[in-house]
Amino acid sequence: MTYTLHRRSLELQGQTRKYLVVEPESLPSRPDVLFFFHGSLQSGNVLRRFTNNTFDALAERTGTIVVYPNGVDHHFNDCRGTLPTKTRELGIDDVAFTREMLTRLKDEYGVGRTFACGYSNGGQMVLRLLIDAPGLLNGACIFASTFGAGSNHAPSNPDSAYEPTPVLLMHGTADPLAPYEGGVAGVDASQTRGEVLSAPETAARLAKWNGAEGPVEERVYADIVKQCWTGDFSVELWTMEGIGHVIPSGNELDARLGKNTTSFQAADVVERFFGL
């Protein structure tokens, strides 16, 4: 292991907010920072295991500082109108939390570029950052999440606040919790997260906002189709056929999440897309 794991905390809104910082042994003078927001009921450490430590390995080989924030009561206050969680009840400001973490990281390390990945609820948090913290990110990656539909799309800022940002999306067509084709997201009717757009609709909306052209479609693996919208701010959608609510990381996960793929590892694609 050629990195140090730091457990950090800060005070915000009367809450002690915690986050993990993976600091590689070899750091450039202005290292990039990659925030990775966990899914519902997870934590930073759970996400590290969930991804088979592949993003810790990314930190090691690229000199990127990887940060795993912890949500309040294991959730982030994302951009959906429907979010029946404690973090929404308390009005937690996870945009401010992200800004404060980044300020502290800049003070300590002198940061170059800033990126964010998010899975499920964490992916929704990244979508919120794109609109409610425009220009904060140099790139975003969203796993198993799509824009809310209609009134379920509820960031604080209007969509017009968005600033063009390269975005990578990965979504399984057999996702049981965040339907690839859109519809009602959530475990069941009692735990719904409201109506959401499809993955292709979400990618197309981001591409339009980015002024990117396409898509050009390519089958990159037997079970993976990549669609690319190109321009100064590109968008890629990786459609994972028959795959569930997962982050491809070469490991076996809870069968209730659906099938995983062994065709590729997400961390490798993120590294290439962000140019880490």
Regions found by a protein language model. Name each.
Residues P31, G39-S43, I243:
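Active-site glycine-rich loops that stabilize anionic/oxyanionic intermediates
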Residues L41-V46, H74:
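Serine-hydrolase catalytic-loop signature spanning alpha/beta hydrolases and amidase-signature enzymes
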Residues D175-A178, H245-I247:
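Acidic catalytic loop of the alpha/beta-hydrolase fold
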Residues F36-G39, Y68, T239:
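Structural cue for short, hydrophobic secondary-structure segments
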Residues K86-E108, R128:
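Alpha/beta-hydrolase active-site loop
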Residues N70-D93:
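Cap/lid segment of the alpha/beta-hydrolase catalytic domain
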